[in-house]
A protein has these predicted regions:
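Substrate-recognition/cap helix-loop segment adjacent to the acidic, metal-dependent catalytic center
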Residues: 110-124, 129-152
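Conserved Lys-Pro-Asp/Glu-containing loop-to-beta segment of HAD-superfamily phosphomonoesterases
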Residues: 160-192
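Surface-exposed amphipathic alpha-helices with a cationic face
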Residues: 113-120, 171, 192, 196
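Glycine/Thr-rich beta-alpha phosphate-binding loop at enzyme active sites
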Residues: 150-162
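N-terminal helical cap/lid subdomain that shapes the substrate entry/recognition surface
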Residues: 2-119
Length: 200
């Protein structure tokens, strides 16, 4: 058995937890409507939610993920001008994620990350999510950036787990073979299946 030198973390449900905070979610909905110039917040969010369903079906069926601009231009607000969408797409995606809950590092997560790094492991994040900027901003703001040697996001590479290529990309960026890496995640169908297919 190979000695483990690298560890990949999933985010949602593993390293980060979403908490239902009504005031936080309502503020995100208001900001989205403001950015879009929509006078009726509830009607606007109902429309976005309805349009998100076929996007989600496509993403799960095809193991693909759209970047911020494509998400809004093709799926959620296709009637809006290109210039407007390019201006607001990143914040719209961020706020839509906030509308789904307030996220924070799982209890004990920082201690685990620090402990592994101190023992010489190379660390990476491999996650399926919409939003190109949120995770990089979060890592900077919470001063976690120095602990991670690579971050592979479906919204940036445009493929989703269980596609093993996400894990192969992570291994290449760590400079390690898949057999030298481990994956910490919560979803058997997406995370564990993808990692095993990549020989992690």
């Amino acid at each position: 058995m190979e000695k483990i030198k690298g560890v990949f973390f999933d985010l949602g449900g593993t390293l980060r937890i979403a908490e239902h905070v009504p005031e936080h979610e309502a503020a995100a909905a208001r900001r989205m409507a403001e950015l879009a110039g929509a006078p009726d917040v509830d009607a606007f969010m109902e429309m976005v939610e309805k349009r998100y369903e076929p996007y989600r079906d496509w993403a799960l069926t095809e193991n693909r993920e759209a970047g911020d601009y494509e998400l809004w231009a093709k799926w959620l607000l296709p009637e809006y001008p290109e210039e407007k969408l390019r201006e607001i797409c990143h914040e719209m995606t961020f706020q839509y994620r906030q509308f789904k809950g307030k996220r924070h590092l799982v209890e004990g997560g920082l201690e685990v990350i620090r402990g592994l790094k101190a023992r010489g492991y190379r660390l990476g994040i491999i996650s399926n999510l919409i939003g190109e900027n949120e995770i990089y901003d979060w890592l900077r703001e919470d001063r976690l950036e120095p602990y991670f040697d690579t971050v592979i996001l479906s919204s940036v590479c445009h493929i989703r787990k269980p596609d093993p290529e996400m894990y192969r990309m992570g291994c290449r960026e760590l400079g390690l073979r898949p057999e030298e890496c481990a994956s910490v995640a919560d979803n058997l169908n997406r995370d564990i299946t993808g990692a095993k297919a990549a020989h992690i």
